[in-house]
Swiss-Prot record:
One of its GO terms (biological process) is nucleotide metabolic process. It comes from Rhodococcus erythropolis (strain PR4 / NBRC 100887). It comes from the Bacteria. This is Nucleoside triphosphate pyrophosphatase. CDD domains: Maf. Its EC number is 3.6.1.9.
Length: 213
């Protein structure tokens, strides 16, 4: 049986996969995202940046899979960033930065880019690879100062790309989206299905055998 391994510490990505009938192993990648982005240079296309980061995250965990004694594995790596005013924004990391970002994006729209990489691993070796990105337009509301400060105080927007979530508290401040909602959460199911097919895996082969209803 093929085992899916999620190369991410994101609880949101894990929740999306579990809700879709998959029970992945989780192995957290330790790649230096800033270094990879810097090596690509300032002129790199935003879509390339998130895709290369997803590829690096997926590849980084492969050597450690040998200890799991798995013979047939697909590794999924993802990276999300918000593209606004021509600039890519990852996790703000601080309240001040998150506040400034919300001041710039409130009442406007931006594009959430998510790079995806799927690796087929057999006997510890990468035998097939497929990668691509998704792009979803997010239309933001204009939260009141009180609501925004309360949101910032929760700490949620500090640790997510673009300083917002769709599936949690941040969803109150998203007017609508154009595109795949799961990709905004961090892992696009339609795109992952396509990439799995490219490496020779049917998504139904990854579903849990027991009923999920």
């Amino acid at each position: 049986m093929t085992q899916l391994v999620l190369a991410s510490a994101s609880p949101a990505r894990l929740a999306v996969l579990r809700a879709a009938g998959v029970s992945p192993l989780v192995r957290v990648s330790g790649v230096d995202e800033d270094k990879i982005a810097d090596n690509l240079g300032p002129d790199a296309a935003p879509e390339k940046v998130v895709t290369v980061l997803a590829e690096a995250k997926a590849a980084e965990i492969v050597p450690g899979l040998a200890a799991d004694n798995l013979t047939d594995v697909v590794v999924v790596g993802c990276d999300s960033m918000l593209l606004i005013d021509g600039q890519l924004q990852g996790k703000p990391g601080s309240v001040d930065i998150a506040r400034k970002r919300w001041a710039a994006m409130a009442g406007r729209s931006a594009t959430l880019l998510t790079g995806h990489c799927v690796l087929r691993v057999a006997d510890g070796r990468i035998v097939r690879m497929a990668s691509d990105h998704s792009a979803t337009v997010v239309h933001f509301a204009q939260p009141s100062t009180e609501d925004l400060e309360a949101y910032l105080a929760t700490g949620e927007p500090l640790q997510v790309a673009g300083a917002f979530t769709l599936d949690s508290l941040g969803g109150w401040f998203v007017e609508r989206i154009e595109g795949d909602p799961s990709s905004v959460i961090g892992i696009g199911l339609p795109l992952v299905r396509t990439l799995l097919e490219r490496v020779g895996v049917s998504v139904s082969d990854l579903w849990r055998t027991q009923s999920i209803f």
